């Protein structure tokens, strides 16, 4: 009999493994990514204070278009980079959220780099 693996459970397990090693401070906060079927979300977090400093997603009012493709992820990456630079954040630690660094997650990271963030 074949075992059917729960993808969400495996992703959360990978995310916990990655989060043990990644930690965001106020000087170098963490850029966290979450992707759903229809949208993509990114937020910059200070783990010491436990606060979200900046957030952007394909659900925001300034975003136009389909939120579930690679182009949308790149736009969200540029949006979060612009908001972060306005707040004086130039360097972040990238947290891929247990997802493979490919497709929408990779495009969001590239968009953030193009926007001026360093990680």
Curated annotation (Swiss-Prot):
Listed SUPFAM superfamilies: Translational machinery components
Gene3D superfamilies tied to this protein: 3.30.420.100
GO molecular-function terms, A-Z: 5S rRNA binding; structural constituent of ribosome
Record flagged with keyword Cell inner membrane: no
Pfam families recorded: Ribosomal_L18p
InterPro entries the UniProt entry points to: Ribosomal_uL18_bac-type, Ribosomal_uL18_bac/euk
Keywords: Ribonucleoprotein, Ribosomal protein, RNA-binding, rRNA-binding
One example of a Gene Ontology biological process annotation: translation
Domain of life from the UniProt record: Bacteria
Cellular component, GO annotation: cytosolic large ribosomal subunit
Family: Belongs to the universal ribosomal protein uL18 family.
Subunit structure: Part of the 50S ribosomal subunit; part of the 5S rRNA/L5/L18/L25 subcomplex. Contacts the 5S and 23S rRNAs.
Function comment: This is one of the proteins that bind and probably mediate the attachment of the 5S RNA into the large ribosomal subunit, where it forms part of the central protuberance.
PANTHER family, alphabetized: 39S RIBOSOMAL PROTEIN L18, MITOCHONDRIAL, LARGE RIBOSOMAL SUBUNIT PROTEIN UL18M
Protein known as: Large ribosomal subunit protein uL18
Originating organism: Clostridium kluyveri (strain ATCC 8527 / DSM 555 / NBRC 12016 / NCIMB 10680 / K1)
């Amino acid at each position: 009999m074949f075992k059917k693996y729960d993808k969400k459970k495996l992703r959360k397990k990978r995310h916990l493994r990655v989060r043990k090693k990644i930690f965001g401070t106020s000087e170098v906060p963490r850029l966290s990514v979450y992707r759903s079927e229809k949208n993509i979300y990114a937020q910059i977090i200070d783990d010491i204070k436990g606060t979200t400093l900046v957030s952007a997603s394909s659900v925001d009012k300034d975003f136009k278009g389909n939120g579930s493709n690679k182009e949308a992820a790149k736009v969200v990456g540029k949006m979060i980079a612009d908001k972060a630079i306005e707040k004086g954040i130039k360097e972040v630690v990238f947290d891929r959220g247990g997802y493979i660094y490919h497709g929408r997650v990779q495009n969001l990271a590239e968009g953030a780099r193009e926007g001026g963030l360093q990680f």
